[in-house]
């Protein structure tokens, strides 16, 4: 297991359950799942049928803990590729990682609704914002007209 390493001048260590801040939301998840690890998830993120995993790493900065999230893709021989960084220097002590089908879901704070969902884009060989095209969670279209170009009412979500 990858416990500690240096990348781009930063000394990072694997985030542990004890790096999570205590909260009612976290206790509720522990009650539901029994064994709950907020900073490690596994699944098939690239659709190749091989197990992949995402792991948060911790950097101890002057202002506290900063989390970096990496995905490790599985290989044909049962090992994993080098880390592919998805999120850098985020606050995650009150949040967690999850996988929803083939999406990596990063929730910075369990008590708040906003999440960031990342989809692997094989053609670009990188993770992209899964909600960017759909506009999910955006408020920049509030000034848009109430009708679409074909004169049908716009559905407000």
Spell out what each predicted region is.
Residues 1-11, 79, 89-157:
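Acidic, small-residue rich beta-repeat scaffolds with periodic aromatic anchors
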Residues 1-38:
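Terminal domain-start segments
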Residues 29-31, 58-63:
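Short consensus segments that form the blades of beta-propeller domains
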Residues 40-48:
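Acidic, divalent-cation-chelating loop motifs in proteins
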Residues 47-57, 101-107:
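Acidic/hydrophobic-patterned starts of short beta strands in beta-sheet-rich repeat architectures
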Residues 62-70, 113-116:
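Structural motif
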Residues 78-84:
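Surface-exposed loop/edge segments in extracytoplasmic proteins
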């Amino acid at each position: 297991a990858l416990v500690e390493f240096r990348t781009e001048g930063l000394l990072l260590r694997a985030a542990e359950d004890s790096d999570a801040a205590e909260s009612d939301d976290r206790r509720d998840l522990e009650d539901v799942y029994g064994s709950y690890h907020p900073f490690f998830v596994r699944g098939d993120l690239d659709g190749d049928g091989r197990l992949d995993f995402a792991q948060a790493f911790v950097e101890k900065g002057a202002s506290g803990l900063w989390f970096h999230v990496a995905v490790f893709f599985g290989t044909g021989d049962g090992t994993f590729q080098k880390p592919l960084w998805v999120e850098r220097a985020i606050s995650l002590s009150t949040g967690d990682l999850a996988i929803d089908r083939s999406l990596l879901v990063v929730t910075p704070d369990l008590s708040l609704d906003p999440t960031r969902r990342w989809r692997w884009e094989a053609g670009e060989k990188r993770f992209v914002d899964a909600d960017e095209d759909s506009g999910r969670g955006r408020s920049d279209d509030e000034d848009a007209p109430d009708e679409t170009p074909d004169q049908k009412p716009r559905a407000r979500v």
